[in-house]
């Protein structure tokens, strides 16, 4: 059995880690390199850096952060946010990222997934999906630009398309659950897992250790992403893992 992973996510804006609720109201959490080292020591299996800077200066600061972090990190580092081209991916991998996460750029140009997968290998390419449930149309749709713009692309169609194009992993954020700490969107995640064979990282809603136990007990996703509850020290990576083990689920 493949062991489940717990992955802290750091949203980085202009060189600082920030966190909001449902993609709004950002507050400063701290220095990304220091936080990355803390999670490295605390038993995290991987780290995700999401660059939400709006400026060129912010994006350049991100490269420095990645380089400083990667030189001291012993776990895989995935970097996403603002990636538009193969050149951007090359730059991130050269600065120490192990994987890249594509979102808006992949929706705009799906061939970028195939080109990136062919050039760097499927294992490097994670597709991030901000999934919004539209109650009027009774379907989940993909959002772009950090969850701000709704597209007409249905999530269940998109996940199958990206797998065929060469994505190695999916990072699915249920926007209605993000930062709410009420539990993961189990039904939605289970449905996505039934449509693809690649690993899924679940994001949005993890409010306590038990939510991660439920996630892994009720779906076959590979990993759970956590931000607020870890940054605010409401729980720790080890406490989450201990609860998962006690639930009879194999975890790294």
Swiss-Prot record:
Signal peptide: none annotated. It is found in: Cytoplasm. The keyword Signal does not apply. It comes from the Bacteria. Pfam families: His_biosynth (PF00977). The keyword Transcription regulation does not apply. Keywords: Amino-acid biosynthesis, Cytoplasm, Histidine biosynthesis, Lyase. One of its GO terms (biological process) is L-histidine biosynthetic process. GO terms for molecular function: imidazoleglycerol-phosphate synthase activity; lyase activity. It catalyses: 5-[(5-phospho-1-deoxy-D-ribulos-1-ylimino)methylamino]-1-(5-phospho-beta-D-ribosyl)imidazole-4-carboxamide + L-glutamine = D-erythro-1-(imidazol-4-yl)glycerol 3-phosphate + 5-amino-1-(5-phospho-beta-D-ribosyl)imidazole-4-carboxamide + L-glutamate + H(+). Its main location: cytoplasm. The active site is at residues 11, 130. Its EC number is 4.3.2.10. It is an enzyme of class 4 (lyase). GO terms for cellular component: cytoplasm. Pathway: Amino-acid biosynthesis; L-histidine biosynthesis; L-histidine from 5-phospho-alpha-D-ribose 1-diphosphate: step 5/9. IGPS catalyzes the conversion of PRFAR and glutamine to IGP, AICAR and glutamate. The HisF subunit catalyzes the cyclization activity that produces IGP and AICAR from PRFAR using the ammonia provided by the HisH subunit. Heterodimer of HisH and HisF. PANTHER family: IMIDAZOLE GLYCEROL PHOSPHATE SYNTHASE HISHF (PTHR21235:SF2), IMIDAZOLE GLYCEROL PHOSPHATE SYNTHASE SUBUNIT HISF/H IGP SYNTHASE SUBUNIT HISF/H (PTHR21235). Belongs to the HisA/HisF family. This is Imidazole glycerol phosphate synthase subunit HisF.
